[in-house]
């Protein structure tokens, strides 16, 4: 396992944004607004129910999730890489590493404002 993130992992969140993203992921997991794994993230994008996509930059090989940024750009959904798949797995509430996760849409959600705040920050990274 390498300590340097893959250069293909762009945009990579800084430490503060990573913490904020993982906090929202944890809350979304409790609210049943989270899909874990590259396959489920792909399904949410195809169904049009994804707010944003989080991917792990230390995924090995990184190519197994590089179809997601292309799909995100087609569907106009923001995406971001976080440095650690283990931290993403913990935030998702599972004991295994998670390489991709999707926050899903729910207008009646209690954490809607936090989701939109993080979504805006991710969108500024993509510009």
From Swiss-Prot:
Q: Which domain of life is it from?
A: Eukaryota
Q: Which residues form the signal peptide?
A: none
Compartment annotation: Nucleus, Nucleolus
Q: Which Pfam families match?
A: Ribosomal_L7Ae
Q: What keywords tag this UniProt record?
A: mRNA processing, mRNA splicing, Nucleus, Ribonucleoprotein, Ribosome biogenesis, RNA-binding, rRNA processing, Spliceosome
Q: Name one GO cellular component term.
A: small-subunit processome
**GO MF annotation, one:** RNA binding
Keyword Endoplasmic reticulum recorded: no
Q: Identify the InterPro entries for this entry.
A: eL8/uL1-like, H/ACA_rnp_Nhp2-like, Ribosomal_eL30-like_sf, Ribosomal_eL8-like_CS, Ribosomal_eL8/eL30/eS12/Gad45, Ribosomal_eL8/Nhp2
The UniProt transmembrane annotation reads none
**GO BP annotations, alphabetical order:** maturation of SSU-rRNA; mRNA splicing, via spliceosome
Which family is this sequence assigned to?
Answer: Belongs to the eukaryotic ribosomal protein eL8 family.
Give the record's subunit note.
Component of the U3 snoRNP particle. Binds to the C'/D and B/C motifs in U3 snoRNA. Component of the 25S U4/U6.U5 tri-snRNP particle, a subcomplex of the spliceosome. Binds to the 5' stem-loop of U4 snRNA.
Purpose:
Common component of the spliceosome and rRNA processing machinery. In association with the spliceosomal U4/U6.U5 tri-snRNP particle, required for splicing of pre-mRNA. In association with box C/D snoRNPs, required for processing of pre-ribosomal RNA (rRNA) and site-specific 2'-O-methylation of substrate RNAs. Essential for the accumulation and stability of U4 snRNA, U6 snRNA, and box C/D snoRNAs.
Record-given protein name: 13 kDa ribonucleoprotein-associated protein
Naturally occurring in which organism (per UniProt): Eremothecium gossypii (strain ATCC 10895 / CBS 109.51 / FGSC 9923 / NRRL Y-1056)
